[in-house]
A protein has these predicted regions:
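Serine-hydrolase catalytic machinery in alpha/beta-hydrolase-like enzymes
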Residues: 51-84, 88-184
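Short alpha-helix in the alpha/beta-hydrolase fold that links the catalytic acid
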Residues: 131, 249-259
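Alpha/beta-hydrolase fold nucleophile elbow
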Residues: 185-195
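Gly/Ala-rich beta-loop-alpha elbow adjacent to hydrolase catalytic centers
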Residues: 194-198, 202
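A conserved short beta-strand
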Residues: 212-222
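Short beta-strand/loop motif that positions the catalytic acidic residue
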Residues: 239-241
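Acidic catalytic loop of the alpha/beta-hydrolase fold
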Residues: 244-248
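C-terminal catalytic histidine-bearing segment of alpha/beta-hydrolase fold enzymes
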Residues: 263-307
Length: 307
């Protein structure tokens, strides 16, 4: 048979080159490739919580256009918070390729529990930071993260508060909460609490937390109404509501209780003889008696579950 020595030599060189590439890729590039792939999958799973209740603006956000609701909120008094517990502002990634912030107080000793604190409609102001620190000092060895749901905006007027709450993008709200869940890690057990707009966010965050959810307290926030969404809850709920308000009124509370029962979830509620925002940290005219009773209920509830 006819032989082409030059061809065979070239072929052998190509084989050796391919073997060199394989060896080089296996020993060097493969390690980088695997590491990169691991990071991609880690990022994917970190933000892979099921979508919950942020497809569209809910009843709470729609209240931002109600003049009576707007006037029901007393303007917060000026207050500057200086943390005595080592609280600091932190940043974390969100699944929409942005960053979010929060006021974070780490536990004195390593703890699997983290309490998410959700702002009123004013934003993450210093009153909320003070309340976050109050929970921290009362509950003991629990991490606390007060999440900034307005991306740095803080209202000092009713008009701005209404604009921020009503104009918040539901998809962005969900992304911020998912980012916070990823920030505390997959092994964290998450409790939630919030007032007004934050009360609604507290319930939604517990749904998004899935199996990581450990406890949920909501102060007079508009409840999730879809039973299929409530079925995703992996914790019971303590709801603290105002009997004298016309918005999230006793009828809304009864509907919430019925929906939770249909969903097969535990719920405890208390309707106080008070107006909306009676316990808001930023409310200078808060109802002292109702606030103290609600606080004690919330603390006892958390202590029974975060242990």
């Amino acid at each position: 048979m006819f032989k082409n020595n030059r061809f065979e030599t070239k072929l052998a060189q190509n084989r050796n080159f391919r073997l060199h590439l394989r060896k080089n890729f296996s020993n060097q590039a493969m390690k980088k490739y695997i590491a990169t792939l691991a990071l991609v999958f880690a990022s994917f799973f970190a933000f892979s919580q099921a979508s919950c209740c942020f497809v569209k603006k809910d009843g709470m956000q729609l209240l931002a256009s109600n003049k009576t609701f707007i006037k029901s909120h007393a303007l917060p008094k000026p207050y500057h918070h200086v943390s005595k517990a080592g609280g600091v502002m932190v940043e974390f990634k969100t699944p929409d390729d942005q960053m979010a912030k929060g006021f974070y107080i780490p536990a004195d000793k390593p703890s699997e529990y983290t309490l998410f604190v959700f702002q009123e409609w004013w934003g993450l102001n210093d009153h909320i930071k003070r309340e976050a620190e109050h929970f921290y000092s009362t509950l003991g060895n629990v991490n606390v993260l007060a999440i900034d749901m307005y991306d740095g905006k803080v209202a000092t007027t009713r008009e701005d508060a209404a604009k921020y709450m009503g104009g918040a993008n539901p998809a962005r709200l969900e992304a911020i909460i998912k980012g916070a869940i990823a920030y505390v890690g997959p092994k964290a057990k998450i409790a939630t609490v919030g007032w007004c707009f934050g009360g609604s966010l507290s319930l939604k965050a517990s749904i998004l937390a899935g199996k990581q959810a450990a406890a949920c307290v909501m102060y007079y926030g508009m409840p999730v109404k879809e039973v299929e969404q409530l079925k995703l809850l992996q914790t019971d709920v303590l709801g603290l509501f105002a009997g004298k308000e016309q918005f999230i009124n006793p009828t809304v509370v009864k509907e919430f209780e019925a929906n939770m029962k249909t969903a097969g979830k535990g719920i405890q509620t208390k309707i106080f003889d008070a107006q909306h925002a009676f316990a808001n940290p930023s409310n200078p005219a808060y109802d002292k008696a109702a606030t103290e009773e609600a606080w004690n209920m919330a603390i006892n509830y958390f202590k029974n579950r975060l242990k």
